[in-house]
Amino acid sequence: MMSIPVNPTNASIQPQSLYDAWADLAWRAMLTEVNLSPKPGLVDRLNCGAHKDMALEDFHRSAEAIRDWLPRFMEYGASCTRLPPESVLAGLRPLGMACEAAMFRATAGVNTHKGSIFSLGLLCAAIGRLYQLRQPITAQTLCATSAAFCRGLTARELRQNNLQLTAGQRLYQQLGLTGARGEAEAGYPLVIRHALPHYRALLAQGRDPELALLDTLLLLMSLNGDTNVASRGGSDGLRWLQQHASFLLRQGGIRTPDDLVYLHQFNQQCIERNLSPGGSADLLIVTWFLAQISQVNH
């Protein structure tokens, strides 16, 4: 395992102003998602959704704590370009765990952004690697590089037959859900093939950015085998949420402010069923982040 770089050692390896710009986009992605309202079952500006243990302010504090760690993921990605990509993840883990600890300190123990630390950590490390190798930094190359980092991850961590199964292992064995690991190892297909093109198309049509993002969240909810939902509601809860999101999309989705009433109703139903599509929220963060990548001129 390579050591984690602490201080810049070479200006060509540590383009700090660029790293800070990309990190700022990732931080803004987390804030954009949590402030987006109304979201079914999720914490937003209006209520706490199906969560009784967290509030909007927890997410704001969490995002701020994570923000300082994001450039370090990039630094590590840039520092280990001689490693094969599948060997990078082992060196990222200590950074991810330290970032998680900072999140838990900021939220007094509430898990607000653990999934985003995983996905944004991978993407930020991919940025560092691609920048150092002078390769294009696009949504496609970032997702492909993240997939290379995670090669074999699902088999290693979900297919084990431990005496004490983790929540992820249990959902994999019972329902075949691979969660955040599987999505990352596959190169974020729900984002690259579905959510990102959908979001970009709505913006190109002149749609309101917030309404476009809410509609994109519905699309993710309709397609994603969300382990957050399945852990709360089982296969029946997941099927219901996917089908209801699909129904709203077939009815036209979220195109005007008048359509927000359907999201308010959906939110109330999620609260009653104790369902929270946190995995889809994490993928929405990835979607928004990748949609903004071209803003950084490198």
Curated annotation (Swiss-Prot):
Annotated EC: 2.4.2.52
Lineage, opening ranks: Bacteria, Pseudomonadati, Pseudomonadota, Gammaproteobacteria, Enterobacterales
Species whose genome carries this gene: Salmonella arizonae (strain ATCC BAA-731 / CDC346-86 / RSK2980)
Domain of life: Bacteria
Record family assignment: Belongs to the CitG/MdcB family.
Matching Gene3D superfamilies: Triphosphoribosyl-dephospho-CoA protein
Keyword annotations of the record: ATP-binding, Nucleotide-binding, Transferase
Pfam family, one: CitG
Catalysed reactions, semicolon-separated: 3'-dephospho-CoA + ATP = 2'-(5''-triphospho-alpha-D-ribosyl)-3'-dephospho-CoA + adenine
NCBIfam families: citrate_citG (TIGR03125), PRK10096.1 (NF007503)
Record-level Gene Ontology MF annotations: ATP binding; triphosphoribosyl-dephospho-CoA synthase activity
GO biological process, alphabetically ordered: prosthetic group biosynthetic process
Top enzyme class: transferase
HAMAP family the UniProt entry points to: CitG
The keyword Transferase is annotated on this UniProt entry: yes
Protein's name in the database: Probable 2-(5''-triphosphoribosyl)-3'-dephosphocoenzyme-A synthase
